[in-house]
Swiss-Prot record:
Source lineage: Eukaryota, Fungi, Dikarya, Ascomycota, Pezizomycotina
pH dependence, entry free text: Optimum pH is 6-8.
GO MF entries: serine-type endopeptidase activity
Functional description taken from the UniProt entry: Hydrolyzes gelatin, casein, the chromogenic substrate azocoll and the cuticle of the nematode P.redivivus. Immobilizes P.redivivus.
Secreted among keywords: yes
Domain Peptidase S8: 130-426
Predominant subcellular localization, coarse grouping: secreted
Induction notes from the record: By easily metabolized forms of nitrogen, including ammonia, nitrate and amino acids, and by glucose.
UniProt EC number: 3.4.21.-
Protein name per UniProt: Cuticle-degrading serine protease
Keyword Phosphoprotein (UniProt): no
């Protein structure tokens, strides 16, 4: 009888334990497009002390090491790079884990969620033509193309962090009259080589701040290398780069430019929020899949300025993503800018990757024209709300039929001059 009673009590205790246990966690983004096998982003709960985080990661590292000794074949890497955004408390780590260690992580009370790492890529295609700077400074978009801007502002005093494949900082486009470069290296999550082996990042930087091809010709650009020479990387690497930017950029005088993307990611979108809350305006490419931008990151992040691409006729590029999350359409077809194969090399390519740096440069321009800098909300409002109707319109297939795209021309005057800066917006 006593035995039966004890069994009953144990059963009740077991039920009580299960009742008070936390929800069973699952890996988000598992099986998503571009998922990287056995690689994960672990997001910890906010408010954990440094000692609690260290205790957790040490325990997971020890567990992983013990399990790995019993496994055959290649072992996963274990706990890798850690991240912590002081602006919001968003923190965690990335790593490669076997199934047993992954389950231990999922069961840990310190963990908020676990996301499978995914591939991110550039958004560029090669074509011919040049016209983008003319389009952001004129309503009349007929040739010959010219660019009008406030030379006393022109991005002076601002820094744009190009989260991409790197920058050829010795390129002529970034050299000053005294022989120094406005381009510098900041962070590299890819390799130990501070160079742009692809060219994409150098092209974007040239559109932002090049002395010939740039929107903000006096801005500084910083290379944040998160993509390889092949133009791809991981969500984990991108988040690490964003973490570095959030902790090192000067609030209200900085812009982050991200001409990249991949599958929708809660972690990546959270990192966008962290950058925004750190006082850094963040501009991202919408993507080149001709789909709703709500399906990809960082384009789907609410606090990002998401940029689609138009061609020289002000038509939305056939490759551009679309949808209600697009804030701005900017020049993205046949854009000429600097390239990484030599200090004088240029190249013409297309994509929302090319549209994004036009707006990042414009954000830097607006910041430099504002006394004391400007916070991200102010710059976002400046770019997205100062609108009037552009001639012509067409229906958007992704909106209800009664809604129409009004071609909008953002036309705003710098407080320092009468030079007009224009850009097409959704």
């Amino acid at each position: 009888m006593l035995t039966n009673g004890l069994i009953s009590l144990l059963a009740i205790a077991g039920l009580a334990t299960n009742a008070f246990a936390g929800p069973i966690r699952k890996v988000s983004n598992a099986g998503a497009a571009g998922a990287i096998a056995d690689k994960y982003i672990v997001v910890l709960k906010k408010g954990l002390s440094d000692s609690a985080v260290s205790k957790h990661t040490n325990r997971i590292s020890s567990f992983h090491s013990n399990v790995a000794r019993d496994l055959t074949g290649a072992r996963a890497h274990g706990v890798g790079r850690k991240f912590r955004f002081s602006s919001t408390g968003f923190n965690g780590y990335v790593g490669g884990f076997d199934k047993a260690t992954l389950q231990e992580i999922l069961n840990s009370p310190e963990v908020d969620y676990v996301e499978q790492d995914t591939v991110v890529t550039t958004y560029a295609e090669q074509t011919d033509s040049t016209w983008g700077l003319d389009r952001i400074s004129h309503e009349d978009y007929s040739a010959p193309y010219t660019y009008e801007y406030d030379e006393t502002a022109a991005g002076a005093g601002t820094t744009v962090y190009v989260i991409d494949t790197g920058i050829r900082i010795s390129h002529d486009e970034f050299q000053t009259v005294n022989g120094s470069s406005r381009a510098t290296w900041g962070f590299n999550s890819v390799d130990k080589t501070d160079s742009d082996g692809n060219g994409h990042g150098t092209h974007c930087a040239g559109t932002i701040a090049g002395k010939t091809y740039g929107v903000s010709k006096k801005a500084k650009v910083v290379a944040v290398k998160v993509l390889s020479a092949g133009g791809s990387g991981s969500t984990a690497g991108v988040v690490s780069g964003m973490n570095w930017v959030a902790e090192n950029a000067t609030p209200n005088f900085s812009v982050a430019s991200m001409s990249l993307g991949g599958s929708k990611s809660t972690a990546l979108n959270a990192a966008v929020d962290c950058i925004f809350n750190a006082g850094i305006t963040i501009v991202v490419a919408a993507g080149n899949e001709n789909q709703d931008a709500k399906n990809v990151s960082p384009a789907s992040a609410p606090n990002a300025i998401t940029v689609g691409a138009i061609d020289s006729s002000n038509k939305i590029a056939s490759l551009s993503n679309w949808g209600t999350l697009i804030d701005v359409f900017a020049p993205g077809v046949g854009v000429l800018s600097s390239w990484a194969t030599s200090d004088k090399e240029t190249k013409t390519i297309s994509g929302t990757s090319m549209a994004c740096p036009h707006v990042a440069g414009l954000a830097a321009y607006y910041i430099s024209a504002s006394e004391g800098g400007a916070d991200p909300a102010t710059i976002t409002d400046k770019i997205t709300s100062s609108r009037r109707q552009w001639s012509g319109h067409r229906e958007h297939p992704w909106l209800p039929k009664q809604d129409r795209l009004q071609r909008i021309c953002l036309s705003t005057h710098s407080p320092k001059t009468n030079h007009q800066v224009t850009i097409v917006a959704s």
